[in-house]
């Protein structure tokens, strides 16, 4: 099964078994807010179609800042709509669920997650 994992934000992290990186969806001067949505749709489409992705996994929106949660929710909606149109399965996980699965504790700090990834995946530069 080919999986595309997304950490959705204005700078969206993505990973598959073959590639990973960050998509910068930041608006340029004079662009409408909808350009973020268009950029993300284009990037997701490109990866899904070129790598024959079967499942898209995303982190659920969370945080303290309402505007960031709204932006993340809009971006996630774009991904869900694309997946529905193309009949691609998708799922969402909270940060706590991801941390608990990966480290056994749902409240690990990001630095601890990185250390665990380095420990597990020695063949990859992290």
Language model features with spans:
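Phosphate- and other anionic-substrate recognition elements at nucleic-acid/protein interfaces
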Residues: 1-126
């Amino acid at each position: 099964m080919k999986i595309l994992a997304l950490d959705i934000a204005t700078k969206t992290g993505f990973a598959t078994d073959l590639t990973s990186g960050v998509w910068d969806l930041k608006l340029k001067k004079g662009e409408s807010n909808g350009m973020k949505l268009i950029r993300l749709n284009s990037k997701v489409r490109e990866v899904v179609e070129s790598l024959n992705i079967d499942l898209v996994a995303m982190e659920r929106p969370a945080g303290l800042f309402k505007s960031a949660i709204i932006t993340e929710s809009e971006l996630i909606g774009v991904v869900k709509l694309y997946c529905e149109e193309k009949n691609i399965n998708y799922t969402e996980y909270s940060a706590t669920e991801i941390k608990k699965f990966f480290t056994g504790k749902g409240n690990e700090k990001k630095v601890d997650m990185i250390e665990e990834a380095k420990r597990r995946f020695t063949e990859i530069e992290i």
